[in-house]
């Protein structure tokens, strides 16, 4: 679903994917949790990891949840291969660099935190007394929760998402009408980007829940895909349509993702990121380049859309262009020229049908 979220988010998703309910690793962790033995598991057997291992014994056997459960009864750590297919060592003592800072309490969790920061590997600490599973990697710390708790939160987030998508639909419908009338203001654009990013942040939360739930999340995943199928793509295309020409739209998108919730509320702050400083949002009119609308026309390749925007600069000019003018653009023949003209006409008609211009 989410393709371009920030790297830290993606790292956490990767971790949750391999530990979702139903995976062999999660089954092993749950067995240890139920037995209340506690445990420390390191994923990865690189030289860097083996250099801080002292003692224990070599297993080098195929991974299975029952093997891990039995080995966790011993005090030492378990070392798994990076692909979690083999158990490399057991009952190992780990000697991380004591100068690596940690705010964890308890020997097991302090060791796990330090190793994760020192090596960048995934380290799992299973608490004997608190009965929780904590995952560490680099500076990430995440506590796995019971599926019933996550399912409740996921359903609640889904209800919130439905409300946000409803508001976003109205904002986008309004923007569509204004784009075809060439009456878009910076306020309209920044509101659309703000609302889209708000939706994407809830989607990311939902994706995290889905990763944690594993095969228990099929229904929620289907509902999520139905709700927000093209939302992230729309946000990127909005930025391409309206950011200043000298700016890299991917960097702009990264900056918007990095905004805090408080900053995201401020439309002037979003406007500044897109290259507009010290201008009144409501009174400043701006024309779209046309990326978003052209991408909505079926069977028009991305490279052709690039050529159209490069030639005509604005959506208004594309709409006013004749078949002959479109035909001259590289990659556009008579058939594509008709497809673009007819496609834009249909989109304009649809926008007028859907219009729900928000009174400001």
UniProtKB/Swiss-Prot annotation:
The first-level EC class reads transferase
Superkingdom assignment: Bacteria
The cofactors it requires, by name, are: Mg(2+)
Biological role stated in the UniProt entry: Participates in a DNA-damage check-point that is active prior to asymmetric division when DNA is damaged. DisA forms globular foci that rapidly scan along the chromosomes during sporulation, searching for lesions. When a lesion is present, DisA pauses at the lesion site. This triggers a cellular response that culminates in a temporary block in sporulation initiation.
Q: Which BP terms from GO are recorded?
A: DNA repair
Q: Which InterPro entries match?
A: DisA, DisA_sf, DNA_integrity_DisA_N_sf, DNA_integrity_scan_DisA_link, DNA_integrity_scan_DisA_N, DNA_integrity_scanning_protein, HhH_motif, RuvA_2-like
Subunit structure and binding partners: Homooctamer.
Listed under catalytic activity are: 2 ATP = 3',3'-c-di-AMP + 2 diphosphate
EC number annotated for this UniProt entry: 2.7.7.85
Annotated positions binding ATP? 76, 94, 107-111
A Pfam family that this protein carries is DisA-linker
Query: Which PROSITE patterns does this entry report, sorted A to Z?
Result: DAC (PS51794)
Per the record, the similarity remark reads: Belongs to the DisA family.
Q: Please report the stretch or stretches of sequence annotated as the DAC domain.
A: 9-147
Tell me the HAMAP family matching this sequence: DisA
- Which GO molecular function entries does the Swiss-Prot or TrEMBL record give? adenylate cyclase activity; ATP binding; catalytic activity, acting on DNA; diadenylate cyclase activity; DNA binding; hydrolase activity
Identification of the protein by name:
DNA integrity scanning protein DisA
Q: Does the keyword Nucleotide-binding apply?
A: yes
């Amino acid at each position: 679903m989410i393709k371009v979220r920030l790297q830290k988010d993606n790292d956490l998703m990767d971790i949750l994917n391999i530990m979702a309910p139903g995976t062999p690793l999660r089954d092993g962790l749950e067995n240890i949790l139920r037995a209340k033995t506690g445990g420390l598991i390191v994923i990865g057997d690189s030289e860097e990891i083996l250099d801080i291992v002292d003692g224990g014994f070599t297993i080098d056997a195929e991974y299975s949840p029952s093997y891990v459960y039995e080995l966790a009864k011993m005090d030492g750590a378990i070392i798994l291969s990076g692909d979690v297919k083999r158990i490399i060592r057991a009952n190992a003592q780990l000697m991380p660099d004591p100068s690596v800072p940690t705010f964890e309490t308890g020997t097991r969790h302090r060791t796990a935190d330090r190793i994760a920061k020192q090596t960048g590997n995934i380290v799992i600490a299973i608490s004997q007394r608190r009965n929780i599973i904590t995952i560490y990697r680099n500076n990430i710390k995440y506590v796995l929760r019971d599926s019933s708790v996550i399912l409740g939160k996921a359903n609640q987030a889904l209800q919130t998402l439905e409300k946000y998508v409803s508001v976003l639909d109205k904002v986008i419908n309004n923007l569509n009408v204004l784009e075809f009338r060439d009456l878009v203001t910076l306020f309209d654009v920044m509101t659309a980007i703000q609302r889209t990013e708000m939706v994407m942040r809830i989607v990311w939360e939902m994706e995290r829940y889905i990763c944690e739930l594993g095969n228990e999340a099929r229904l929620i995943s289907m509902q999520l895909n139905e709700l927000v199928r093209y939302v992230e793509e729309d946000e990127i295309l909005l930025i391409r349509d309206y950011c200043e020409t000298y700016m890299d739209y991917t960097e702009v998108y990264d900056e918007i993702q990095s905004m805090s919730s408080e900053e995201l509320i401020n439309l002037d702050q979003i406007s500044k990121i897109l290259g507009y400083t010290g201008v009144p949002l409501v009174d400043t009119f701006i024309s779209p380049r046309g990326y978003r609308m052209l991408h909505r026309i079926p069977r028009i390749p991305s490279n052709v859309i690039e050529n159209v925007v490069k030639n005509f600069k604005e959506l208004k000019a594309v709409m006013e262009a004749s078949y002959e003018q479109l035909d001259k653009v590289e990659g556009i023949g008579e058939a594509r020229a008709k497809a673009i003209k007819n496609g834009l006409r249909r989109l304009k008609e649809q926008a007028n049908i859907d219009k729900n211009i928000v009174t400001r």
